[in-house]
């Protein structure tokens, strides 16, 4: 792995001079191998190590180099054609392979090569970009989008129209992460490398970026860039210092643990926000 990383890091420093026709065969092979490993879930753009999320920047570099070494080509899709540098993940899948990997893909869901879809995941008509990871047993609902390099945990439900932001550049920016057992309500957006902690419930129409104030009404604490585990979050507002107006905020109305979630439905949690 260290040799692969060294080749990618070195090539990235010379990326402006790399074209599909001029790329060194060793670099091409290293990039393609990295994308194949991403596609198979053997490596990830980010992973949790000792309780902290670690971003593997060299993997993001490989994704960016993948665009430089490929020409656009015609891709066959559901009833139409596409013209792009990244092939579709399931282009060469057979019925046997779908069964072996135990995933369900509903047309016209679009998944780019270099993303990983774990066992028992369900993709309704949705979009999953290169470098993304969708965990075991998760559902990506209708018109939801999983951006480049976004990390979706196990048993997550991304409801209809949800947007999970992608990030390739700037290189130092971290990916958006939805941890295990989260529920993201319809038409919500989580972007700019925000981390939603395990077991959280995000209500419909909540928008969270790095500058969004995430207000915990129980403690009065304001978070940025991270929703604490087990949070139930709704749209809200906070007054300005002068008191003349209010600005948007995401509001943590309560905290729940796994035991509570197993006994109480999502809708019940959201209906009882004044409890």
Swiss-Prot record:
One GO location term (cellular component): cytoplasm
GO biological process: diaminopimelate biosynthetic process; lysine biosynthetic process via diaminopimelate
Keywords: Acyltransferase, Amino-acid biosynthesis, Cytoplasm, Diaminopimelate biosynthesis, Lysine biosynthesis, Repeat, Transferase
Pathway per the UniProt entry: Amino-acid biosynthesis; L-lysine biosynthesis via DAP pathway; LL-2,6-diaminopimelate from (S)-tetrahydrodipicolinate (succinylase route): step 1/3
InterPro entries registered for this protein in UniProt: DapD_Trfase_Hexpep_rpt_fam (IPR005664), Hexapep (IPR001451), Hexapep_transf_CS (IPR018357), THP_succinylTrfase_dom1 (IPR023180), THP_succinylTrfase_N_sf (IPR037133), Trimer_LpxA-like_sf (IPR011004)
Record note on quaternary structure: Homotrimer.
Name this polypeptide is given: 2,3,4,5-tetrahydropyridine-2,6-dicarboxylate N-succinyltransferase
Gene source species: Tolumonas auensis (strain DSM 9187 / NBRC 110442 / TA 4)
């Amino acid at each position: 792995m260290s040799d692969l990383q060294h080749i990618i890091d070195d090539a990235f420093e010379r990326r402006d001079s790399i074209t599909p026709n001029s790329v060194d065969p060793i670099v091409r092979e290293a990039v393609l191998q990295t994308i194949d490993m991403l596609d198979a879930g053997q490596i990830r753009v980010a992973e949790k190590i000792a309780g902290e999320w670690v971003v593997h920047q060299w993997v993001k570099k490989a994704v960016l180099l993948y665009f430089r070494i490929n020409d656009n080509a015609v891709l066959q899709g559901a009833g139409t054609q596409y013209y792009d540098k990244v092939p579709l993940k399931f282009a060469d899948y057979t019925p046997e392979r779908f069964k072996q990997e135990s995933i369900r893909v509903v047309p016209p869901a679009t998944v780019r090569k270099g993303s990983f879809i774990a066992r028992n995941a369900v993709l309704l008509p949705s979009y999953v970009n290169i470098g993304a990871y969708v965990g075991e047993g998760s559902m990506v609902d209708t018109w939801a989008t999983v951006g480049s390099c976004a990390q979706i945990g196990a048993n997550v439900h991304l409801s209809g129209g949800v947007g999970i932001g992608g990030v390739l550049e700037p290189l130092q920016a971290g990916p958006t992460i939805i941890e295990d057992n989260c529920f993201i309500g319809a038409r919500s957006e989580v972007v700019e490398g925000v981390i939603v902690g395990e077991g959280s419930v995000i209500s419909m129409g909540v928008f969270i970026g790095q500058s969004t104030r995430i207000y915990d009404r129980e403690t009065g604490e304001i978070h940025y860039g991270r929703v604490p585990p087990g949070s139930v979050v709704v749209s809200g507002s906070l007054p300005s210092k002068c008191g003349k107006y209010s600005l948007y905020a995401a509001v943590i109305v309560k905290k729940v643990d796994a035991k509570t979630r197993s006994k109480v439905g999502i809708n019940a949690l959201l209906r009882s926000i004044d409890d």
